[in-house]
Structures are given as structure tokens and as C-alpha cells.
From Swiss-Prot:
Gene Ontology terms: biological process: DNA strand elongation involved in DNA replication
Entry keyword annotation includes Nucleotidyltransferase: yes
Pfam families xrefs: DNA_pol3_beta, DNA_pol3_beta_2, DNA_pol3_beta_3
Name recorded for this polypeptide: Beta sliding clamp
Origin superkingdom: Bacteria
Cysteine pairs bridged by disulfides in the record: none
Keywords (A to Z) from UniProt: Cytoplasm, DNA replication, DNA-binding, DNA-directed DNA polymerase, Nucleotidyltransferase, Transferase
Organism: Micrococcus luteus (Micrococcus lysodeikticus)
Taxonomic lineage: Bacteria, Bacillati, Actinomycetota, Actinomycetes, Micrococcales
GO CC annotation: cytoplasm; DNA polymerase III complex
InterPro entries recorded: DNA_clamp_sf, DNA_polIII_beta, DNA_polIII_beta_C, DNA_polIII_beta_cen, DNA_polIII_beta_N
PANTHER family named in the record: BETA SLIDING CLAMP, DNA POLYMERASE III SUBUNIT BETA
Subunit structure comment from the entry: Forms a ring-shaped head-to-tail homodimer around DNA which binds and tethers DNA polymerases and other proteins to the DNA. The DNA replisome complex has a single clamp-loading complex (3 tau and 1 each of delta, delta', psi and chi subunits) which binds 3 Pol III cores (1 core on the leading strand and 2 on the lagging strand) each with a beta sliding clamp dimer. Additional proteins in the replisome are other copies of gamma, psi and chi, Ssb, DNA helicase and RNA primase.
Entry's family note: Belongs to the beta sliding clamp family.
Compartmental location: Cytoplasm
Length: 310
């Protein structure tokens, strides 16, 4: 195998694929990136039994072939290279990476030991990447970080026709966000449980590339996302998610409009005196909301932020 490609193109591709690598892979080969060179195209893939990532880049392929090398080491190497063309070549049991006068030699891992990548599910529709990323950012903050309750580390994604609803809770907070999308089947009706960290990673790495394609399999254990030639899959979380939609009121008799940045900053300051897992109180009156924390002889704090009651 031997191919040549611009440094920035290779760096971007390797960096994206390496983001899916587990810091503690269950088997050594899963720390590697699978690189396949064919006529004019190089594909790079990673897999950890839960998530997979794959993409293709154009390259000058002199000799076709396939190798498996340490993803994190290759990522560190290509990021350090100067702005010039990079040649990647298999030489015996080593992979040589050459850029101008820089030359690196990497050990390979047995390609035959690498598990087969999951088949990509069929395209189910497209959604605006920016809207998807914004919704994910708003909802995942309410997902649990406690792995002893894996069901709550997931976000429930409900799809009904042209509407996608994201729901999350950690038992203390609730979050829900609806966005529109363009389904291939207008009558689609399904729900998925996707790990919050998976959605966050998809939003970061694929949400800025225009339209985001959502891929749904025939079985209920895999979901995929694709944008700009990059494709990723994730195993779904199994279990019964709490029925939290009904906890959101149909309407609210009173609404308060407040500057987001001012409320966040005030909350951070007042929370400095709050003990762990204690409440920060919010009192709404005409023209302001007062934040209060701490009681008795302990430290206390309060701050008011302008607001409009509707």
C-alpha cells in the first residue's frame, strides 16, 4: 500500500476518525485505525463495538492495500507534520509516514483480527445540522452522567412524521426540544434511545456540515448519521425510558422573559454558597427575579436580575 495526500486533508480525516477510539479498548486492535487505499480513494475507519466512524478522502494511490495502525499515535504524528504532501507506505510490517524531511515508522496490527464494521442503516431522512446541534446542546445537559443508571445517560429521540423530539432527564431535571426534519417516509413513527455523549459527539463533528442524514436500520439496535462524506453508527441503549413527556405542562399561566447570559452569571455567583445538592431559590416579582442560596449561620447570597412577566 502506498498513497500521497495533502497534510491538511489527512490530518482532518485522521483526527475525526480517531475521536471515536476508546481510551481503554477491550482488545488492542480496537485502538487502531483501519486504512484502506484503492483507486484514487483512501478510506479511514474506527470501531469500538459500540460506535463506528468511517470516511473517504481523495488521494494519489500508487499501490492499493489495507493496514491497521495505532490511531492515537498516527493522529499525533500527522498533526505535527509541516504543510506539505504526506506519503503513507506499507513497508514489510511497518507503515512509513513521510513529509519533506520528516519520516516516521509505525508498527502495524493484524488486519485479520479487526472486527467487521457494522453495515450502515438505510437513510431515513435529513435534518438541518445546525438545528440538530442546537437541540442536542439544549437537551443533553439534563441527561445523567451516572453510569450505574445507563438508561438515564441516554436521550430519548421520538420521531413522528416531520417532527423529532429530544427528551432527557437525570431525575432532577427535565429537558425537551422539538425540531423539524424531512423524512423519507412521511408516516414514520419510531423512538430511539441514544447515549447523550454519542449525540454530543455527532453534533460537534457533523452538525456544522449543512444537512445531516439520519440512518435507521431494520432492527432496533443501531442508528447512523452521515454528513459531508463522513458516516458514524452507534448501538442504541436498551430499556424502558421514563415517561417524562407528560410531566411537561400543556400551558403555563405565567412566563418570565429574562436575559440568558445575565441569569447564568447570577446563578453561578449565588451558587458559590450553596451546599452540594441544595436548592437555589428563584423568586419572581414584577420586573425582576431574585436568586437566593444559603441559610442560617452559614454563608448566604442573593442577586436580582431584571425580567418581564407575561
Amino acid at each position: 500500500m502506498k498513497f500521497t495526500v495533502e497534510r491538511d486533508i489527512l490530518t482532518d480525516a485522521v483526527s475525526w476518525a480517531a475521536r471515536s477510539l476508546s481510551p481503554r479498548p477491550p482488545v488492542p486492535v480496537l485502538s487502531g485505525l483501519l486504512i484502506t487505499a484503492e483507486a484514487g480513494v483512501v478510506s479511514i475507519a474506527s470501531f469500538d463495538y459500540e460506535t463506528s466512524a468511517r470516511l473517504e478522502i481523495e488521494a494519489d494511490v500508487e499501490t492499493a492495500g489495507q493496514v491497521l495502525v495505532s490511531g492515537r499515535l498516527l493522529n499525533d504524528i500527522v498533526r505535527s507534520l509541516p504543510q506539505a504532501q504526506v506519503t503513507v507506505e506499507l513497508d514489510g510490517g511497518k507503515v512509513l509516514v513521510t513529509c519533506r524531511s520528516s519520516r516516521f515508522s509505525l508498527a502495524t496490527m493484524p488486519v485479520g483480527d479487526y472486527p467487521a464494521l457494522p453495515e450502515l442503516p438505510a437513510p431515513a431522512g435529513t435534518v438541518d445540522g445546525a438545528a440538530f446541534a442546537h437541540a442536542v446542546a439544549q437537551v443533553t445537559v439534563a441527561a445523567s452522567k451516572d453510569d450505574t443508571l445507563p438508561i438515564l445517560t441516554a436521550v430519548k429521540v421520538e420521531i413522528e412524521g416531520d417532527t423529532i423530539t429530544f427528551l432527557a432527564t437525570d431525575r432532577y431535571r427535565l429537558a425537551m426540544k422539538e425540531i423539524r426534519w424531512t423524512p423519507a417516509d412521511p408516516s414514520i413513527s419510531t423512538s430511539l434511545l441514544i447515549k447523550a455523549r454519542t449525540l454530543t459527539e455527532v453534533a460537534k463533528s457533523l452538525g456544522s456540515g449543512g444537512d445531516l442524514e439520519i440512518l435507521l436500520g431494520q432492527t432496533a439496535d443501531l442508528v447512523g448519521f452521515a454528513s459531508g462524506g463522513r458516516r458514524t453508527t452507534s448501538v442504541l441503549v436498551d430499556g424502558e425510558y421514563p415517561k417524562i413527556r407528560s410531566l411537561f405542562p400543556e400551558s403555563s399561566p405565567i412566563q418570565a422573559v429574562v436575559d440568558t447570559a445575565a441569569l447564568v452569571e447570577a446563578s453561578r455567583r449565588v451558587a458559590l454558597v450553596a451546599e452540594r445538592n441544595t436548592a437555589l431559590r428563584m423568586v419572581f416579582t414584577e420586573g425582576q427575579v431574585t436568586l437566593d442560596a444559603g441559610t442560617g449561620d452559614d454563608a448566604s447570597a442573593n442577586e436580582s436580575v431584571p425580567c418581564t412577566l407575561e
